[in-house]
Amino acid sequence: MKFQIKKRFSNEILIEGEANSFKEFVEANKADLSEADLSNANLSETDLSNADLYKADLSNANLSEADLSNADLSEADLYKAKIKITQKDEIIKALKIEIIT
């Protein structure tokens, strides 16, 4: 199947190609998804470890059980994104948020 991911700000094609599924396509291209429009995407159980999601639009995306270890989510739009409570620490780290105690 053919897939494409567009840039969130300009609607230009960021990446296009073929894969068996959208999940597989995203995993194969996770190295540079900065400014990607992934709004409303079902990314549950997707391996996004080390993904560059800087300024990506992940609003309303399903990120439950996605592996976000060492991902860069800085300045990403996560409005109404769905995650599991067990992912909260990974998300905080990926957003580069420092918790002060």
Task: Kindly give the residue locations of the regions a language model identified.
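Intrinsic low-complexity/IDR segments
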Residues: M1-A36, Y54, S69-N70, S74-T101
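Periodic short-repeat tracts
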Residues: E35, S39-N70, E75
